[in-house]
Amino acid sequence: MVGKTESTEHERMRKALATWFTTQGLSNVKTPADPVADMVPDVQADYFAKIVYGEAKLCEDFATPDTKDELLNYCGSLPSEYKLVLGIPKACEPTVQRALTEWGFTHRIQLVGL
């Protein structure tokens, strides 16, 4: 989520994720997203009649339980037809994929290396 003290690296990842949304043909890309279920995702876009949300994460974010809790909140709060795209640095893609598998999030989250 976009916070008051966004790091330069997180800002770069958030903007890269918004650009990726555009290159995938999604429309009405916004960053930050509109609030949804008491959360403010980093990016939002339209894909036909559905909304796609995006979260930018850094490699070090996966060493904290806060990230798991935040993703659990997204998966539990967003309607099942909504998709969450997780933008991460390519360098940590295998590690993050393992974490998502262990946490049971692979069915609701699309991982994108940026």
Give each language-model segment a name:
Residues 1-36:
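Acidic-basic catalytic patches of nuclease active cores, encompassing PD-(D/E)XK
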Residues 17, 43-74:
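Conserved catalytic cores of phosphodiester-cleaving nucleases, focusing on short active-site segments
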Residues 26, 79-81, 105-106:
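Short, well-ordered coil/turn elements that cap or connect secondary structure elements
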Residues 33, 55-60, 87-90:
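Structural motif
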Residues 50-53, 80-87, 109:
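Hydrophobic beta-strand segments of well-ordered beta-sheets in folded domains
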Residues 64-89, 93-99:
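Short, charged, amphipathic alpha-helix that recurs within catalytic cores of restriction-modification
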Residues 90-114:
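Domain-level recognition of nuclease-like catalytic cores that cleave nucleotide substrates
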